[in-house]
Curated annotation (Swiss-Prot):
It catalyses: a phosphate monoester + H2O = an alcohol + phosphate. Gene3D superfamilies: 3.60.21.10, Purple acid phosphatase-like, N-terminal. Fe cation binds at residues 141, 170, 173, 335. It comes from Mus musculus (Mouse). Keywords: Glycoprotein, Hydrolase, Iron, Metal-binding, Secreted, Signal, Zinc. This is Acid phosphatase type 7. Belongs to the metallophosphoesterase superfamily. Purple acid phosphatase family. One of its GO terms (cellular component) is extracellular region.
Length: 438
């Protein structure tokens, strides 16, 4: 073998281990990426979260001009996150909260430090008070592969169609996969949406690895429960996010079931005391109480854990949500869309034959888990259940417009049919007597 050939082979053997070859995301740097917004519940604020690959200052510069100077500054903190995979990859998660924002005003911002800045993004500060009409995109189960709803969500976001996003669990498939590189890729994919709108979340079963560590580290939600459960107010609505996963991954602590349940009851009591101002109570949790899909998931069982609790009697949520008059319950997990008739304990409680969702006598359940992932869509059983109103086995997402304290408009958008509205329903409830279902 010639010296030249031997040297060339040695170089080729070293090449895969060269930091420059493995890609920019592996080489330590401080240019922000994976930028996303969230709302921590304090009026006039917005929180910016991003990732770098080396320590750096956490600063956001913001203003009102797209190309002009950004006169305002806000500073925050960064925390190292070490993924639980074998490579123990380290990310630096930065959080900065912008304050004293003018309600409804549009802002331009960039984040980073003198060592590296992001490009500029735009967002609209949430309006204060109860007398406005929030518009939300709602979906679950969106992966880094096959995220069918994402292109339309990007376009709708750019057109100013939404004030916030509710992602009802299951991200990336999975954020911990490939030593958390799949999580990185997913967070980059959603950036065109999440850097412009508060991207509000709840955990799903695909987040459970290493005790939900990627979920807890990457997102910034209200409260002090690491985003597992929290609530916030938006216009005439009180929105509650919670973890159905505490009922299934018991090795992370059975005490979490009771802890969350007590928190939920306390939060619902407070929400009902404020119900004149904010009549709507909306929940979001990943695994449904009911579903008519052709699989063996918990929601196909008559005594599902989320509905009835452990052993069919401990800390079930259906009785709790019914007791405090929850209006609307969003779920995902099933890779399909299903709207139920107003329901309690397997009985349909329509408002009337002609207008089932006008003054319904039970909560309305909507399963919206068809945003798109590698696991494809979930089929339904052939014959619809008597409590199932609409079933759609197509990729898409849900739009919710909370018009005022009495009227709410819900639509399902089909990506398979190029944005066609495949479900359209108004939920109407009177201002008075909201807590009790009669």
């Amino acid at each position: 073998m010639s010296p030249f050939l031997g040297g060339w082979l040695f170089f080729c053997m070293l090449l895969p281990f060269s930091p420059g070859v493995q890609g920019a995301q592996e080489y330590p740097h401080v240019t922000p990426e994976q930028i996303h917004l969230s709302y921590l519940g304090e009026p006039g604020t917005m929180t910016v979260t991003w990732t770098t690959w080396a320590p750096a200052r956490s600063e956001v510069q913001f203003g009102s001009q797209l190309s002009g100077p950004l006169p305002f500054r806000a500073h925050g903190t960064a925390r190292a996150f070490v993924d639980g995979g074998v490579l123990r990859r380290k990310l630096y998660i930065h959080r900065v909260t912008l304050r004293k924002l003018q309600p409804g005003a549009q802002y331009v911002y960039r984040c980073g430090s003198s060592q590296g800045w992001s490009r500029r993004f735009r967002f609209t500060a949430l309006k204060n008070g109860v007398h406005w009409s929030p518009r939300l995109a709602v979906f679950g189960d969106m992966g880094a592969d096959n995220p069918k709803a994402l292109p339309r969500l990007r376009r709708d976001t750019q057109q100013g169609m939404f004030d916030a996003v509710l992602h009802v669990g299951d991200f990336a498939y999975n954020m911990d996969q490939d030593n958390a590189r799949v999580g990185d890729r997913f967070m980059r994919l959603i950036e065109p949406v999440a850097a412009s709108l508060p991207y509000m979340t709840c955990p799903g079963n695909h987040e459970q690895r290493y005790n939900f560590s990627n979920y807890k580290a990457r997102f910034s939600m209200p409260g002090d429960n690491e985003g597992l459960w929290y609530s916030w107010d938006l216009g005439p609505a009180h929105i509650i996010s919670f973890s159905t996963e505490v009922y299934f991954f018991l090795h992370y602590g059975r005490h979490l079931i009771e802890k969350q349940f007590r928190w939920l009851e306390n939060d619902l009591q407070k929400a009902n005391k404020n119900r004149v101002a904010r009549p709507w109570i909306i929940t979001m949790g990943h695994r449904p109480m009911y579903c008519s899909n052709a699989d063996l998931d918990d929601c196909t069982r008559h005594e599902s854990r989320v509905r009835k609790g452990l052993h069919g009697k401990l800390f079930g949520l259906e009785d709790l949500f019914h007791k405090y008059g929850v209006d609307l319950e969003f779920w995902a997990h099933e890779h399909s869309y299903e709207r139920l008739w107003p329901i309690y304990n397997y009985q349909v409680f329509n408002g009337s034959l002609e207008s089932p969702y006008t003054n319904p006598r039970g909560p309305v359940h909507i399963i919206t888990g068809s945003a798109g992932c590698e696991e494809l869509l979930t089929p339904f059983v052939r014959k619809p259940r008597p409590w199932s109103a609409v079933r759609v086995k197509e990729y898409g997402y849900t739009r919710m417009h909370i018009l005022n304290g009495t009227h709410m408009h819900i639509q399902q958008v089909s990506d398979d049919q190029d944005g066609k509205i495949v479900d359209d329903v108004w939920v109407v409830r009177p201002l008075l007597g909201r807590m009790m279902y009669h």
